[in-house]
Amino acid sequence: MADVIKLRKGLDINLKGKASMDVTLQVEQTEEYALVPDAFVGVTPKVVVKEGVHVNSGDALFVNKACPEVKFASPVSGTVTAIERGERRKVLCVKVKADAEQQATDFGKKNVDVLDGEAVKNALLEAGLFGYINQLPYAVSTTPDTKPKAIFVSALRDMPLASDFEKELEGNEDAFQTGLTALSKVAKVYLGVGIDQHSRALEEAKNVEVNVFDGPCPAGNVGVQVNHIDPVNKGEVVWTVDPSAIIFFGRLFLTGKVDLRKKVAVAGSEIKTPGYAEVLVGTPLSAFVADQLKATEHVRLINGNPLTGVQTDMAGFVGGHTSEITAIPEGDDKDEMLGWILPRTSQFSTSRSYFSWLFGKKKEYDLDARVKGGERHMIMSGEYDKVLPMDIFGEYLIKAIITGDIDKQEQLGIYEVSPEDFAVAEFVDSSKLELQKIVRDGLNTLRKENA
């Protein structure tokens, strides 16, 4: 029987517009797809194709400059139409015009039961899928020279408006199990599931240790699960893998081909019919989101969930780790009489400043993107600890990162954290600090120092 880990710290934020499991959204046929390097944190891309070249799905579009073995596969077959660059020639995306009849590079079917760890890694490297594996410390895309003491997969997505992985798992059970079995050849695999998830593919997963997490957000964060099961110390490495990527891996071993289809939630109060769309990595958002928006102005479109996602627009694409596209009010057209002084019941408050807490925890809120205040000194103490279910002193770690005290950061557990672990803390922070950016900057600095 799976171990149940009860977490008490955290905060569930119920927003209007959660995607319905029963609604399947139409995806318009599109010719152009794009692979975005920024979706793979820590990767400096080196483009290995030229405009006008024809590629098959599974062929590399770019590699990790620091480790050229790590390739990133094209989601479709077609002609490379553009390599878009930004400031200082930064690669923004590689665009491919899809063929009418798709062709995939055949890497050969493999029986994962007879493979060893090196064979699994080599197969993922060859097919351009290895870069979907992240690591702690530093919360970046990993490289094949790392030796993980364990591999963590969290099937629990509990951020506001997050997609339900059980929806994506439907019809992909065999691929999911195959992917888990493959990774178990590299290191011990821990699968984290939620107390309310009852899919047999999760509860009865083989070749892994299943742990059930019962608690508020961010219980589904893989970093939180690592902290409670097998914390990362200096000099140690664990791999963390998105469950969607596990399905990608499984399909590769079962079919010998790269198949980057996934079910993405389209959610938020600004969406007409919140539901799920089956898309490829690299699909333009305009193909399945444009017709679903209630309005085109005063709307914040987010590639991801409202707490950890990235602001985008209709020119954006589904990222390698995207599991939901959300749309919430921007809030720039609001004119509230008396501001926060006016008593109200429709606003969310963790400190019970409004009467909305009387309606219970299940009340849904239509929150907008406003910060409602400027950055200020850290005066309130203990705010982070109430919503950070990890065995670290979050407030002191943030202060150590701000002051650049690397020794103190290491003592306070920076190797165990990733930016999204502080997403809820950032939401409740009365100092209005960008905690996720602070943590990311600290991890980047530490990574350079230890290189």
Model features per residue range: what roles?
Residues V43, V49, A66-E69, T273:
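Short, solvent-exposed loop/turn positions at domain surfaces
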Residues D59, K65, V76, E84, ...:
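Glycine-rich, histidine-containing beta strand-loop boundary motifs that form or position
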Residues E69-S77:
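Short coil-to-beta-strand transition motifs
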